[in-house]
């Protein structure tokens, strides 16, 4: 069984979260936090997170703080996701790059700014499911976790 370690950002932009709205062929639309796989060349999980934010959003984030982790078990893959809260410093979507954008069969990665409130987050399908549960319980607390 393969194990994939991933990092994801709960990226705050004022009182909102920067999320990716994913549209993939043959699948319902869902939302997720930006981030991805920790590569062997990444010096640390935080370095991987900053690389992923640059690739997926052309974004720079301020200080990060780990807030939770979750595991997903598939038939051939065990995925460990570690989530960090951070504030958006800058974002330039024209700088987006990476393999996910090179192949149209990967679907769309639309940026969606969603108020960081349980009411705004409740109606959207957040993946993984533990992300949705965490945000419903802790969305209001996230801004206070950072300097």
Describe each PLM feature range.
Residues 4, 12, 33, 61, ...:
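Short connector loops at helix/strand junctions that flank enzyme active sites
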Residues 9, 66, 84-86:
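A structural signal for short, well-ordered beta-strand segments
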Residues 60-68:
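A short coil-to-beta-strand element that immediately follows conserved catalytic motifs
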Residues 123-147:
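Charged phosphate-binding loop/patch that engages nucleotide di/tri-phosphates or the phosphate backbone
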Residues 1-18:
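Conserved N-terminal beta-strand and adjoining loop/helix that marks the start
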Residues 72-100, 112-117, 129-138:
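Active-site-adjacent beta-strand/loop module that shapes the phosphate/pyrophosphate-binding cleft
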Residues 47, 67-72:
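Internal catalytic or translocation cores that form aromatic/hydrophobic pockets or channels
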Residues 16-55, 59:
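Conserved Nudix-box catalytic region and its N-terminal flanking loop in Nudix hydrolases
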């Amino acid at each position: 069984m393969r194990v994939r370690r991933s990092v994801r950002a709960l990226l705050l932009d004022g009182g909102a979260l920067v999320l990716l709205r994913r549209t993939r062929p043959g699948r319902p639309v869902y939302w997720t936090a930006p981030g991805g796989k920790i590569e062997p060349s990444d010096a640390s999980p935080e370095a991987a997170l900053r690389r992923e934010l640059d690739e997926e959003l052309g974004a720079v984030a301020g200080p990060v703080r780990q807030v939770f982790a979750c595991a997903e078990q598939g038939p051939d893959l065990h995925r460990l996701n570690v989530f960090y809260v951070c504030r958006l410093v800058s974002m330039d979507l024209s700088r987006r790059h990476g393999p996910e954008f090179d192949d149209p069969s990967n679907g769309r990665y639309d940026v969606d700014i969603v108020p960081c409130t349980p009411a705004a987050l409740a109606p959207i399908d957040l993946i993984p499911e533990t992300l949705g549960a965490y945000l419903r319980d802790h969305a209001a607390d996230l801004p206070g976790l950072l300097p």
